[in-house]
């Protein structure tokens, strides 16, 4: 496999990964946002994919040791960026938390109808209300400061 095919695989994997992030779970299409934490996580997944391809399919992939070292270095940098929330400002924070809260609403809406445990049903109902209130508050701040990062 030549370098252009490896690059194509990496790009395709990145796009597929980015489309499969928390936004997929959003309760509302208006809660879908682009933000750095998803970008970091997808880069991390793609990095690990390259490492696994090197380990498992070294003879087929054509990935050099130099490329592997560069990839591992990038993985370390990305892990550092995730753990320290590098470059995450107010806008990135709020636009990252909205799909996270929206996902909690989606999960809670489903469990409310499936559980027989009244405590879980009440907890899920409380989560739906509180998370929606927090999404509304975050949207108000983003609107007020003109920081919206909506996709749709």
From Swiss-Prot:
It is found in: Membrane. Pfam families: DUF305 (PF03713). Glycans are attached at residues 2, 113. Keywords: Glycoprotein, Membrane, Transmembrane, Transmembrane helix. Gene3D superfamilies: 1.20.1260.10. One of its GO terms (cellular component) is membrane. Coiled coil: none annotated. The chain crosses the membrane at residues 5-25, 36-56, 68-88. It comes from the Viruses. It is a multi-pass membrane protein. This is Uncharacterized protein L153. It comes from Acanthamoeba polyphaga mimivirus (APMV).
């Amino acid at each position: 496999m030549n370098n252009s095919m490896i690059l194509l695989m990496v790009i395709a994997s990145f796009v597929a990964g980015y489309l499969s992030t928390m936004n997929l779970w959003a309760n509302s299409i208006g809660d879908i946002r682009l933000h750095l934490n998803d970008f970091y996580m997808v880069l991390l997944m793609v990095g690990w994919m390259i490492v696994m391809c090197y380990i498992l399919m070294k003879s087929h992939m054509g990935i050099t040791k130099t490329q592997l070292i560069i990839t591992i270095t990038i993985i370390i940098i990305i892990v550092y960026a995730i753990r320290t929330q590098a470059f995450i400002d107010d806008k990135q924070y709020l636009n990252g938390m909205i799909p996270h809260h929206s996902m909690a609403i989606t999960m809670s809406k489903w469990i409310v109808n499936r559980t027989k445990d009244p405590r879980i049903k009440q907890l899920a109902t409380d989560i739906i209300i509180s998370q929606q209130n927090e999404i509304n508050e975050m949207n108000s701040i983003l609107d007020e400061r003109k920081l919206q990062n909506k996709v749709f």
